[in-house]
Protein backbone atom coordinates (compact mmCIF):
# COMPACT_ATOMS: atom_id res chain seq x y z
CA UNK A 1 0.00 0.00 0.00
CA UNK A 2 1.23 3.51 -0.76
CA UNK A 3 0.27 6.94 0.44
CA UNK A 4 1.26 10.47 -0.57
CA UNK A 5 2.91 13.10 1.58
CA UNK A 6 2.64 16.75 0.54
CA UNK A 7 5.43 18.82 2.08
CA UNK A 8 5.06 22.44 1.02
CA UNK A 9 6.86 25.69 1.69
CA UNK A 10 10.24 24.20 2.66
CA UNK A 11 12.27 27.41 2.95
CA UNK A 12 16.03 27.25 2.48
CA UNK A 13 18.87 29.03 0.71
CA UNK A 14 21.52 28.13 -1.82
CA UNK A 15 23.87 29.32 -4.55
CA UNK A 16 22.21 28.57 -7.86
CA UNK A 17 21.83 30.45 -11.12
CA UNK A 18 23.30 31.03 -14.55
CA UNK A 19 23.52 34.82 -14.38
CA UNK A 20 26.67 36.60 -13.21
CA UNK A 21 26.78 37.02 -9.45
CA UNK A 22 23.94 34.62 -8.64
CA UNK A 23 26.30 32.16 -6.97
CA UNK A 24 28.26 34.82 -5.08
CA UNK A 25 25.87 34.81 -2.14
CA UNK A 26 23.06 32.56 -1.00
CA UNK A 27 19.57 33.22 -2.35
CA UNK A 28 16.21 32.10 -0.98
CA UNK A 29 14.53 29.01 -2.42
CA UNK A 30 11.27 27.29 -1.52
CA UNK A 31 10.70 23.58 -2.17
CA UNK A 32 7.39 21.73 -2.44
CA UNK A 33 7.43 17.92 -2.39
CA UNK A 34 4.79 15.37 -3.40
CA UNK A 35 6.18 12.06 -2.13
CA UNK A 36 4.60 8.65 -2.66
CA UNK A 37 5.67 6.32 0.13
CA UNK A 38 5.12 2.70 1.07
CA UNK A 39 3.00 2.31 4.19
CA UNK A 40 2.80 -0.91 6.19
CA UNK A 41 0.76 -0.13 9.28
CA UNK A 42 0.10 2.76 11.63
CA UNK A 43 3.71 2.93 12.86
CA UNK A 44 6.26 5.59 11.94
CA UNK A 45 8.83 2.86 11.43
CA UNK A 46 6.74 1.43 8.56
CA UNK A 47 6.95 4.55 6.39
CA UNK A 48 9.18 7.52 5.58
CA UNK A 49 9.54 10.17 8.27
CA UNK A 50 8.60 13.50 6.69
CA UNK A 51 11.14 15.32 8.89
CA UNK A 52 13.92 13.35 7.20
CA UNK A 53 12.55 14.14 3.73
CA UNK A 54 12.38 17.86 4.55
CA UNK A 55 15.94 17.80 5.87
CA UNK A 56 17.12 16.06 2.69
CA UNK A 57 15.51 18.70 0.46
CA UNK A 58 17.12 21.52 2.45
CA UNK A 59 20.54 19.84 2.45
CA UNK A 60 20.45 19.35 -1.32
CA UNK A 61 19.64 23.01 -2.00
CA UNK A 62 22.28 24.20 0.47
CA UNK A 63 25.03 21.74 -0.56
CA UNK A 64 24.92 21.64 -4.35
CA UNK A 65 25.29 24.43 -6.91
CA UNK A 66 23.55 24.42 -10.29
CA UNK A 67 23.15 26.86 -13.15
CA UNK A 68 19.63 25.68 -13.96
CA UNK A 69 16.66 25.57 -11.63
CA UNK A 70 15.57 22.45 -13.52
CA UNK A 71 18.80 20.67 -12.52
CA UNK A 72 18.27 21.65 -8.89
CA UNK A 73 14.72 20.26 -8.95
CA UNK A 74 16.01 16.94 -10.32
CA UNK A 75 18.73 16.77 -7.65
CA UNK A 76 16.21 17.36 -4.86
CA UNK A 77 13.82 14.75 -6.27
CA UNK A 78 16.59 12.16 -6.69
CA UNK A 79 17.97 12.71 -3.18
CA UNK A 80 14.51 12.31 -1.63
CA UNK A 81 13.86 9.21 -3.77
CA UNK A 82 17.00 7.61 -2.31
CA UNK A 83 15.23 7.11 1.04
CA UNK A 84 13.88 3.66 1.86
CA UNK A 85 10.16 3.37 1.26
CA UNK A 86 9.96 6.28 -1.18
CA UNK A 87 8.40 5.19 -4.47
CA UNK A 88 7.95 8.45 -6.40
CA UNK A 89 8.85 12.11 -5.86
CA UNK A 90 7.76 15.32 -7.52
CA UNK A 91 9.82 18.31 -6.44
CA UNK A 92 9.01 21.91 -7.28
CA UNK A 93 11.73 24.46 -6.55
CA UNK A 94 10.68 28.13 -6.41
CA UNK A 95 13.17 30.97 -6.80
CA UNK A 96 11.51 34.09 -5.33
CA UNK A 97 14.26 36.54 -6.32
CA UNK A 98 13.99 35.53 -9.98
CA UNK A 99 10.25 36.16 -9.89
CA UNK A 100 10.68 39.62 -8.37
CA UNK A 101 13.37 40.63 -10.87
CA UNK A 102 11.15 39.52 -13.77
CA UNK A 103 8.00 41.12 -12.33
CA UNK A 104 6.00 37.89 -12.19
CA UNK A 105 4.31 36.09 -9.30
CA UNK A 106 6.57 33.08 -9.39
CA UNK A 107 9.32 31.17 -11.16
CA UNK A 108 9.75 27.49 -10.41
CA UNK A 109 10.96 24.25 -11.95
CA UNK A 110 9.57 20.78 -11.33
CA UNK A 111 10.99 17.29 -11.64
CA UNK A 112 9.41 13.89 -11.08
CA UNK A 113 11.39 10.69 -10.50
CA UNK A 114 10.30 7.19 -9.51
CA UNK A 115 11.67 3.73 -8.87
Residue ranges of predicted features:
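N-terminal, polar/charged subdomain of small-to-medium soluble alpha/beta proteins
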Residues: 1-115
Amino acid sequence: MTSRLFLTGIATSGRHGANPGEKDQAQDFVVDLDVEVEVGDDELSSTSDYRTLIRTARETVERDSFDLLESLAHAVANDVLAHDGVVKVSAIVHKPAAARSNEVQGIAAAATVER
